[in-house]
From Swiss-Prot:
EC class name: hydrolase
UniProt cross-references to PANTHER family, sorted A to Z: CHITINASE DOMAIN-CONTAINING PROTEIN 1 (PTHR46066:SF2), CHITINASE DOMAIN-CONTAINING PROTEIN 1 FAMILY MEMBER (PTHR46066)
SMART domains: Glyco_18 (SM00636)
Active site: 106 (proton donor)
Family: Belongs to the glycosyl hydrolase 18 family.
E.C. code: 3.2.-.-
Gene Ontology biological process terms in this record: polysaccharide catabolic process
Taxonomic classification: Bacteria, Bacillati, Bacillota, Bacilli, Bacillales
Cited InterPro entries: Chitinase_II/V-like_cat, Glyco_hydro18_cat, Glycoside_hydrolase_SF
Single GO molecular function: hydrolase activity, acting on glycosyl bonds
Protein name, UniProt field: Putative glycosylase YkvQ
UniProt keywords, alphabetically: Carbohydrate metabolism, Glycosidase, Hydrolase, Polysaccharide degradation
Amino acid sequence: MFQMSYYYSGLGWDFIQHVDQTNGVLNVVSPDFFYIRKDGSLLLRSANPDVIKALHRRKLKVVPFLSNHWDQDLGRFALMNRVLLAKQISHAIEELDLDGVNIDIENLTEKDRNLFTDFIRLVRKSIPRHKEVSVAVAANPFGWTKGWHGSYDYEYLAKYADYLMVMAYDESRLAGPTASVGWVEKSIQYVLTQKISPQKLVLGLPFYGRCWMEGQSASQAIPLYLVVSKKA
């Protein structure tokens, strides 16, 4: 079973405490120390090798994610420089004894689809086969082929990636659910129509809700732990 969590605050020793509090639920952690420079090359933020070793002793895989953080230009620079970027990712994985990479590049369009797929192909080719490649993809309940949903060729991405991680959240633009059951189910069903093995499909769950202003698109994210602790 694949159970992973992103981690957005580097990889300090406090991370070990957070992981231990999950009581063995996780088997993969994905910290945020892969960034994209403005020229499309890799920026590696500090990662503590001793912390990585401590996670490995806990039988956890360490698979950092690479994201453009919704910056379309940055994502396109990465694709234009994809040969070098794939090699740099491979080198970082080897140097730090990491277990793979999660690619989380968003807000591209159907015009970028082929280059994005080729980037994933290059990443898969550049790193050892036993290392993991996963790709975060848009939830697409209505099968859109234009806009940022259209940047993901689900069928061909699955040929190179070990896992496709469906980002089943941020459903509503106005006041509404973050991830309603019907919307999530349709998103899963669509991916499965794209000739993808169910074993490669990972469901991304939101650890947050939203506080909406009526009639406005603006909202404030509220982490789940605040809701549970009744501090929200």
